[in-house]
């Protein structure tokens, strides 16, 4: 509209008159102007209908039904009028105009509501988050719905949202009551302090329930954990070690590991022993294993020396995923474990199924090395494992012969798949899957790296920079033309 200023000010009929006069002056542009006018007039008609229909009810109903509800529904979430406009839908520009006109009363109502019931207001935003913001805006389109909620808000605005609150968070029914203590989590204070930004606050609020359901340990998940267990910040640190501890305590670890990190975080929060296991974490689960079953862990440490000498045995095992890069070179396992300590606990619980039988078999030292944590975890589960030892003992038997036959390396992978099937349910990490699927060459097969020779290296880019610093600009200018010449 602002693009053609002369025709814009008059209404559509004036448009037609002015255009009829102008085309007579310019005959060549008659068709183009007529088409533009027809399109503009059509657009204007549609816009008029939308603006009249939408603006009148929006302005009238909030005033008649009480600005308070308007603020609760739209003002809080629509403090940014742009967000409100999107929710109104229909005609964007008319919705925006309606928002601007009704925005002032909404903001005032929000201020009043904050003064009247500051604490009660926040629940309105979180319960629906996006849903609530969308519902109130969509409700005005349906006039029947709008008046009904308004009386409810008059009678008790905070109550209806609270009724909505519990369904999204059935696990934490007392959350609204317990909200004040967990304020540090800051899901609540944000809505209270940012009613105008109700939409973002709501977004933050609804997410906690859903991620909590997933058991994610991210801020939202921790909120529930903190509510469920008074130790709000503490559950997170012990969590990484907890998988090892909890698995030790629970002989049937397979089910929990399925969602090890998510589920374990929830389950691990209650058991404080996890904290006890945390200090040993730096040294991997060995110390924890020592506390629970000192005899096996010691073999695990002395075990490393025997394994390295039997490089042939280690080579076939690498593909089997038992050693997982630990046997070929003891230094490698240590860095790998030191970095991903938390993940290995999740990965290791399943392997104990294999390794403990190995203990029963003729190779007790190697299994402890294969997974230091597995020794500790396998101990509680050992009674169950002997039954599987029959299955695993043959594996331990073929392993020694396999080393001489590297071609047989193809054979070791088949047994791992069965174990990987077991672990597939438990392990969420990709390392185990890759180790079971693919065959990794031992270090002995790889060619030795070139010897390191200290030499001075020259970099032309640095040379040019040094010259430019010295002030020889002519050389720089000469250098660029040279490359184009060969081209």
Swiss-Prot record:
Gene of origin? Wipf1
- Residues annotated as carrying Asymmetric dimethylarginine in the record are 33
Protein species of origin: Rattus norvegicus (Rat)
Membrane-crossing segments per the record: none
Q: Can you name this protein?
A: WAS/WASL-interacting protein family member 1
Q: What are the UniProt keywords, alphabetically?
A: Actin-binding, Cell projection, Cytoplasm, Cytoplasmic vesicle, Cytoskeleton, Methylation, Phosphoprotein, Repeat
List residues modified as Phosphothreonine.
329
Question: What protein family does this chain belong to?
Answer: Belongs to the verprolin family.
Q: Where is the composition biased (Pro residues)?
A: 1-14, 157-170, 178-190, 234-243, 269-285, 293-309, 328-355, 397-418
Compositionally biased spans, kind Low complexity: 136-147
Taxonomic lineage is: Eukaryota, Metazoa, Chordata, Craniata, Vertebrata
User: Where does this chain mainly localize?
Assistant: cytoplasm
Compartments where found: Cytoplasmic vesicle; Cytoplasm, Cytoskeleton; Cell projection, Ruffle
